[in-house]
C-alpha cells in the first residue's frame, strides 16, 4: 500500500510541478510588465520577455509582414486573379452608377465636395481657352491670302452664288427705280447733271418738248437693268472683284476689325458664363444619362483593368513607398503591454493551455518513473 501511495505521490507532485512550471514560464513571457528593483538591484527576469523585447518584437513583426505576408508577389497574384478582377469591376460599376444617377445638381455636389468657385473658375478658363484659340487661329490665318485661307468648298459656293447675286442686285435695282422714291432719286440725279451744263439742258428741252427728262430716262434705265447683257456684265465685274479679293492678304482685315473685337464678339455669342451656369444647375443624372451605359459598360471596366495592370506592374514600388514595416513597427510600439498580452493570448490561448497540460503530463510521467525506480532500488 505504501508503495502505491509513494508512486501516486511522486506522480502527482511531478504533474503539479511540471504544469505549474510551464504555466509560470508562460506568465513570465508577459509578467511582470515593468522591471522590479530591490534597492538598486534589478530582480532577474523582470520585466517579462515580451515587455523587455517589445521594440525588437515590433521590428521583427514589421519585417515579417513585409517579407512573408504582404509580398509583391502575393499582392500581384491577387490583382491578376480573374475572380478578384470581376468582383472589383462589379463593385466599381455599382458605386459609379450611384454617383451618375444622383438627382442632385452638379453645383450642389461640387459644393458638398468642398470645391469652391467652380463657376467662376470654369468661366474664366473657358474664356481663356477660347481667346487663345482665336489668337492662334488669327495668327496663322493672317499669313494667308483669302484664296489659301478659305476652304475649296467655300470658293465653289461663292463662285456659284455670283450669278444669283447679280440677278438679285438687278432685281432690287429695277424695283427701286420703278418706285416713286427711285423715280425721285433719278430725277434729282438728272437735275444735278444738267445743272452743271446749262446750255445742254436747253438743247435737250427743245427736243423733248413738254415731256420731262426723267419720264424718258426711267424706262430706259429699267430696260437696261433687265437685259441679260447687263446681268452678264455685272456678273463679270463681281467675278473680277472676287478674283482680286482672293489674292489679297487676310491680314488686311485687321485694319477694319481688331483682334480684341473679334474675341469679344465670339465670347458674347457663346455666352460662356450663362452656359456654365446652366450646366452646373443640371442634375448629375441629366448630364450623365446620355453616356451612362458607355460609362458603366466600357469606361469603368477599362479604367479598373488599366488600374489593376498599373498596380501589378508597380506593386513593389508602391509597397516600398508605403513603408509598411515602419507602419507595423510604429503601431506595435504604441501598444500597451496589457494590450499586447491580450492580443497574443487571444490568438494562442488554447495552444498555451495545451503547453501547460503537456508540462503536467510530462511532470507526472517523470514522477511515475521516479516512483518505479525507487520501487526497484529497494
From Swiss-Prot:
The keyword Amino-acid biosynthesis does not apply. The keyword Transmembrane helix applies. It comes from the Bacteria. InterPro entries: DUF445, UCP032178. It holds the Pfam family DUF445. It is a single-pass membrane protein. One of its GO terms (cellular component) is plasma membrane. Keywords: Cell membrane, Membrane, Transmembrane, Transmembrane helix. The chain crosses the membrane at residues 357-377. It is found in: Cell membrane. Belongs to the UPF0754 family. This is UPF0754 membrane protein BCB4264_A0915. It comes from Bacillus cereus (strain B4264). The lineage of its organism: Bacteria, Bacillati, Bacillota, Bacilli, Bacillales.
